[in-house]
Amino acid sequence: MAGACGKPHMSPASLPGKRRLEPDQELQIQEPPLLSDPDSSLSDSEESVFSGLEDLGSDSSEEDTEGVAGSSGDEDNHRAEETSEELAQAAPLCSRTEEAGALAQDEYEEDSSDEEDIRNTVGNVPLAWYDEFPHVGYDLDGKRIYKPLRTRDELDQFLDKMDDPDFWRTVQDKMTGRDLRLTDEQVALVHRLQRGQFGDSGFNPYEPAVDFFSGDIMIHPVTNRPADKRSFIPSLVEKEKVSRMVHAIKMGWIKPRRPHDPTPSFYDLWAQEDPNAVLGRHKMHVPAPKLALPGHAESYNPPPEYLPTEEERSAWMQQEPVERKLNFLPQKFPSLRTVPAYSRFIQERFERCLDLYLCPRQRKMRVNVDPEDLIPKLPRPRDLQPFPVCQALVYRGHSDLVRCLSVSPGGQWLASGSDDGTLKLWEVATARCMKTVHVGGVVRSIAWNPNPTICLVAAAMDDAVLLLNPALGDRLLVGSTDQLLEAFTPPEEPALQPARWLEVSEEEHQRGLRLRICHSKPVTQVTWHGRGDYLAVVLSSQEHTQVLLHQVSRRRSQSPFRRSHGQVQCVAFHPSRPFLLVASQRSIRIYHLLRQELTKKLMPNCKWVSSMAVHPAGDNIICGSYDSKLVWFDLDLSTKPYKVLRHHKKALRAVAFHPRYPLFASGSDDGSVIVCHGMVYNDLLQNPLLVPVKVLKGHTLTRDLGVLDVAFHPTQPWVFSSGADGTIRLFS
């Protein structure tokens, strides 16, 4: 670059008395135009390149004597003199240009942070106002400042964290939403602040203090400024203040302070009360309690039942006076004139006076509570829909009472067992009997396999459990079920089991029977595990083998208990955990099958438990009893009942939960089915909401029996009930 301050191109050796330039300085000096060139232009950038060259001419004479002399002759000296004169003429111009450049460069060094180059000119407003907009503010021209597109997911951030060496010092600007890289000075500032140090690294908080005003008395004053004139003349302002205060004292506006009284003062509560007033005397009066009125036992001619016998008289004589219910013995006199004087009259009056004199009296405020306020506010039933409200279908076909029923997992088929020795399969939508299987005995319990990929029904008949393939629905599903049962390979050494697995005959196979599990005692209940491979049965015996577990795939039976805890009424599997719930007459025990230990024991406070059901979530249990109680247990709350419902008038026979809706139902011998809304919240701090919503009636009482079993539809808010009248009813 050429400039007005540049010197002519010459070798370093041609300058007499000057130091030889460094190689990098020689590269910077290129052939600039001569100062004498009138066409050469002056600019700030050109002047700043060679600023300070005027110092070269001001070197000491010692450097001049050290330069090269002799051989160059007068010609070289003449050239050096001309060059020195040109540099001397250009020096003032270069110096002024250098000072102007320095002023222009330092113009904004002392500016405050309020004048920084802020890209977002939205102002001092919360940026949360722009969370739902694609921009973050407006520029000086009124155009929107759009947010940068953030399409990077967590994987991209992780890659940046691994690949980018400056990831740890990159932050996001909240004003513009862009990523900023912290400089070394900013990082060092953050480190100092984290260590509790000052932000300025050059600040020394422990500089030595200079005590200017020391304790030594100096001869001369610190300042020797002459005093003002106003310090020698009276102040007019103070004169006006004094005159105003004197005028206020004369007018009585300013009063002198009262002398302080050192004696303490106390507030008298009864200073304003008149002791002779009627209300004052009777305000704290509490009347004495009245004597109890005499009863029939104190009559001179009491009824015969109030007269004590000889045994009661002797027992009364042996008791302590404090333990006696009556402090006298009732007596009978023929007439009132034959009644003698009461021997304890003076003693009772003396005790009465002692009670009035010594016993303190207390005024009890009676609280008037509206009975309606004590009843909890429950939501209206119409706000809790859907739930079954009316009878939709009646399934007729059984000739005797229907003890049990079960619905298929898909909700299309219904199985029922009766005392007439038949097992019927119904179509739910049309109430049509699709198939009737004669089993030759009373069917006490029936359960459809909950696994939707297996078409299998288990029925308890006398001392056997029958596994039946109903052959309804998908043919591939029916065929796969038969293949699953036929794929069993018996072990080489059969183990001793508490039950016998028998193959059915060809005739029974044609009717749909597949397996028969024989037991030593009659079977009262059968239930499936949620996965459909295990089966639990209850036997009517007092032994430890009254509860058995069967595995269908391996045809293996086992007894989970070593000793009996009473007569078992029913069992159930936990829907999500390896728990087995066993209900006896007075308690419900929860066993952990993997750990083989008792987890919890529930006390329903009922005389005789009849049925039990587990909530689909697994945290709540309901059980019915023969003393017309329905008990709700919250397993997370306590082992005692959360709530006891007494809506039925007779014994409860069955209870059930809906798999999807917050509904549960109970069937009783009074011929009714009561549907209740039971909402279980995910919040553990909120208790379940139990509201009875509908009473369904339709069954007729037969032999003092009503509803024997209830079951919900798996997907619809429908409930099925079987009764002693031989019918099955669907309420929707």
From Swiss-Prot:
One MF annotation (Gene Ontology) recorded for this entry: ribonucleoprotein complex binding
Record's note on what induces expression: Expression in quiescent fibroblasts is induced by serum stimulation.
Broad class of the protein's primary localization: nucleus
WD repeat ranges per the UniProt record: 397-436, 438-478, 518-560, 563-601, 604-643, 647-686, 702-732
Pfam families on file: BOP1NT (PF08145), WD40 (PF00400)
Keyword match Phosphoprotein: yes
The family this protein is said to belong to: Belongs to the WD repeat BOP1/ERB1 family.
Quaternary structure (record): Component of the PeBoW complex, composed of BOP1, PES1 and WDR12. The complex is held together by BOP1, which interacts with PES1 via its N-terminal domain and with WDR12 via a high-affinity interaction between the seven-bladed beta-propeller domains of the 2 proteins. The NOP7 complex associates with the 66S pre-ribosome. The PeBoW complex associates with DDX27, BOP1 interacts directly with DDX27.
Record's protein name: Ribosome biogenesis protein BOP1
Naturally occurring in which organism (per UniProt): Mus musculus (Mouse)
